[in-house]
Amino acid sequence: MAADGYPLLLLQKTFPQLLCIEFKWVDIHYSKANSQVLPIMWQIPKFMYAIFREHNTLKHIVDAYGIDTIISDNRFGLWHKKVKSIYITHQIGVIVSPKNKALNYLAYLLHKKIINRYDECWIPDFEGTDNLSGDLSHKYPLPENAYFVGILSRFQ
């Protein structure tokens, strides 16, 4: 298993018998204002480099440890052509700006392109009107490899 920060600590506590690898990601900074356009735009080079770096690091990890399945929790670069790769997200549509529908649609298309690199996309929500994620997962058409898996929670 690979993660960083609190998710890594949770995985180590939950699965102490399994190997855990620290896999850092960049810190994302959001604006306190409604629009995230400029804050996200300024971070695009950092995101692109991080995606490239994590994808290359993953190749080495797969080779070194003989990984046969990857489950990525919203990490864009954690897919591998030769290994079953699953992407988990509740956000198919990305709301970059509440007022700019064209920009939000462009963000959706870019995210869909990322999702299509994976074998499957799991959406932790319910299909239909009784759902938790609203427009984030239900506004735009789902990629062909995406489906709803119900609520995922460690709480019982």
Predicted regions and their residues:
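Structural motif corresponding to alpha-helix initiation and N-cap regions
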Residues: 5, 52-56, 108
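Short loop/helix-cap segments at secondary-structure boundaries that form the rim of catalytic
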Residues: 9-15, 76-83, 115, 138-142
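Short, well-ordered beta-strand core segments
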Residues: 20, 70, 85, 121-122, ...
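Conserved nucleotide-sugar donor-binding subdomain of glycosyltransferases
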Residues: 35-77
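A nucleotide-sugar donor-handling region in carbohydrate enzymes
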Residues: 89, 94-156
